[in-house]
Each structure stands twice: as C-alpha cells, then as structure tokens.
Amino acid sequence: VGTLGIYFTQNGGSYQDGTARINSRMLTDIIMQQIHRDVRQEYEPNWKRRSMWDKSYVEARVPEVPTTLIELMSHQNLADMKYGLDPGFRFTVGRAIYKGLARFMAERKGRELVIQPLPVNNFSIKRTRKDHYQLSWAPTPDPLEPTAMPSKYIIMERTGDDLGFHKIGETKGTHFDINVTDDEIHSFQIIAANAGGTAFPSETLALREAPDGSKPILIVNGFTRISGPGNFSAGGEAGFDAEADFGVPYIKDISFTGYQTEFRRSAGESFGRSGQNYATTVIAGNTFDYPAVHGAAAAAMGKGFVSASASAVEKGDVKLSDYPVVDLILGKQRSTVVGTGKRGVEYRAFPEPLRKALRRYSDKGGDLIITGQYAASDVTGMRSQNGDRDFAEQVLGVSGAESDMTRRGTFRDNRGQSYDYSNTLNEKNYIVESPDVLTAAENAHTTTLATMADGTKTVGIINNRGKSKGQVALLTIPLESITDAKERARIFNTMFKAVTTNK
C-alpha cells in the first residue's frame, strides 16, 4: 500500500513557454506530501509514500505544462481495495490532490492559499409560524486545512417537480428565513463558499405547508452512509461479498463492472476476478435527497412537514417534542468499518445521542415511523453498543433480526397489498439486498405490519407501547426503495394511521 509519483524533467529542459520542467517535480512532491499526510491522518497511519520517478512516460512527457502521474495504490490487492472502493476514501484522496494543485499554483503565482469549504452539517428546517420557515445549519471545520472555512452560504431551492435547483439567496450567517405561500413540496440545499470556491452541496431537506395550516410532522434524515462493499477473509477465501452488502455509492457509481466470482486465495492471478455484467450500468447510490420522497407520501395524506438531519437532532438543535409524529429515514445506515478501522465504527443506525432523543420522545407519547434495511440488526447484532438492545426491545419491539437474501423484491402489508422495491442494481434506486427479518421481543405488544412475499418472514411491525407512550412503526424495507410513488404513499398511510390511532 502506498503512493508513487512520476514526472519528466528532460534533464533540465523547459516547456515551450519557458517554464522549467523541474516544476513537474515540485508539483509531484507537493501532491504526494498532501496525499500522504491526509490519508495517514484520516484512514491509514501506515500509508506509505513510495518513490518519485523522473521517467519519460508519454503522459508526463507530452503536455506542455507541469504534469504529474500519481499511482495511488501499489496494485489492486484486497488490502488496497478496501480503501479504494470506499467513497469517503476517494473523496479524501481527490481533495488532497486538489489541495496539492492549489498549493503549487499559490506558491508559483505568489497568491494566498484558500481551500474550498467542506459541506455544511446540522441542517434543519423549522416552521416559525404559518407559511414561514427558517433554514439553519452549521459550518464544517476541516481539521486538515484551517483555510477551508466558509465566508458565505448560497441557498438553493427546488419546487415541486422541478428538475433542478435555483439560487434564492446568500447569507454570511447560518440561518435563512423563507416564506411559502402554496402547498407544493419545497426542497433546499446549502452550499458553503469562500474565496477558494464552493463546497459540495449539503444534503437536501424539504418542507410542505399543509393546506389547513396544521402542525407539520418531522422527517429526520438519518441515512448518511456511503461505503464500499462488505468484505471477508476466512478459510482460504477472501474478497468482497457485494451480493450480501453492495455498500452505498456517493450519489451514483460508474466504476462497478460485476460481482467478484473468484474468492480462493490459492487461485493465483485469478484471485479477485469479477464479472462484467454491469460494465455499462450506472449504479444508484445515496442521493441525500430522500426527505422530499417521504414528504410526498405524507403530502398524499394532506399533511405538512419539515425535515432535519439526524445530526441536528443529536446536537439538540431540533426538539422532537415539537412534533406529533417523527418519520426517521435510515435507508442502508449500518455500523461500518473502513480498512484497518482507524476511524472506528461509522454510520451507526442509532448513535447514542439519537437513540436517547428518540427514546425520550417515545416515552413522552411521541409517535415514530422508522424505515431502514438494517434498523433492527444494527442494534441487536455484533456491533451493537451498551443500551442498543434495551432500545431495540423496549422501543422498537424487536429482540433480533436476520438477513433475507430474497430475489423477488416484493413484500406485502397486513392487508395483503403487495409492494415492489429495488432489490437489483440499477440507475434509479439504491439496491436493498437483504432487509432485516424481525423477531418480536417477548415482552413487547407488537402486531405484524408487513411480511416478505411468501408471508412467513416479518419485515415490519407496530409496537404498541401503551397509552402514555408513543407507538412505533418499523419497516425494514426503506420507503424510498419502493419503486412506485402510489405504493409508497399507501404503506406510509398504513404506518401513520397505525401509530396515531387506538391510543
């Protein structure tokens, strides 16, 4: 594992404009330093900085500008690719290369270096009064780059079925007030900016004003996971078991060619071989744009809604008690470890601050709708934390969960209505490979909400916690993975009525 750099100086030659070719060596050195430093601090303390080669590679020789070739990894072995397939690692490396280029240009031209910010966090929308809302967020400091702080924020809006976003304002603060005079779904992104450029957009949150002006429900986006596929090593076999856990691309992926087919370490050069079935397929990932999808299901019932990131709930910026019903989006959120685990466990479905906030809310009568593929197994499985199992049994109403590798992609509700969900790789919806099959807790008063198509495996339950406490609907088929909008609205309606009636 490690990074190699290649440049070409032509024994002290110059480019056509007179620039000395030694600048290519300087560029290579700066970028390699940046990659080495950032990867070591963020992912792998033992990441190696390998050689720099002054060689006549055509890609280094032909361009008439300072040029570098970066061989990020020594070769595509399993240890390398645990990082190489991870979208977060790719972002860190890509940002390191960008920062190295910016440093080179700043030094060469004698300019102040300012690095573009990271996306904002703790994004939330609050209804301040009828038709009036406030967007709030927080900047994300970059521990690797002190210059990357925002100096302003750009507010982007999408209305209804618009295909894209348009700018509606700028601010130097971390709040923005808006007025809504219709019952359309309005979606928003915040883009941090400074003299160095703009950050990636924030997650997308949404709102809708109910026609009758009634109190909105709260949609919480807890699906922040991006990751490479699951991996294993046991009994002479190793590799990526992407059929069991494909991982989650950032928005979409165009690099996947096919599932691994050769897992035997003894297979020599064939070890790690994969198919080519998906070489021309765009694979959908986490779009960070699901509150509007859930909101459309709520709107079909005539409901208004606001939305917030789970981190805003965890920080206390959003009070769940202000809302009669909370809809928690978990998608494919799951405890995840990258590489050797320097970053620890990330993307827990119910991190402790969120778990405690949900429990307080439910204990005081708040009703919960929770959808997520791993919503049960992540708090009952091997990576569960102290307090997780109590939460699972007493709030969710489950004591355990197993994966179901069904190929049908169909489930049905307690009325016998069928629903199709995304269970194959495609360019529209992320894949749901193995939804949790639920085991109800012995002391919980649960009823079945949904089963797989065969009717024998429970994937949804209603936990009746008693008259003084809130009701909980749990579905391990993510709502946004249901392919038909009318079907999404139907199952949301079923869950909503189940938790808000018979109290």
Regions from the PLM with identified roles:
Residues 332-446, 450-453, 487-491:
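A glycine-rich, often tryptophan-bearing local segment used as a flexible ligand/cofactor-contacting loop or short
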Residues 103-147, 197-214:
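Pro/Thr/Ser/Gly-rich low-complexity, intrinsically disordered linker/stalk tracts
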Residues 1-29, 53-76:
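Active-site microenvironments of hydrolase-like enzyme catalytic domains
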Residues 55-61, 436-437, 454-468:
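Short, surface-exposed beta-strand/loop micro-motifs that present aromatic residues
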Residues 166-173:
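Short beta-strand segments within Ig-like beta-sandwich modules, predominantly Fibronectin type-III
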Residues 203-325, 329, 496-503:
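Aromatic-Pro/Gly-enriched surface loop or interdomain linker
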Residues 45-111, 476-479:
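Active-site-adjacent mobile loop/cap segments within catalytic or ligand-binding domains
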Residues 177-198:
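Beta-strand-rich modules
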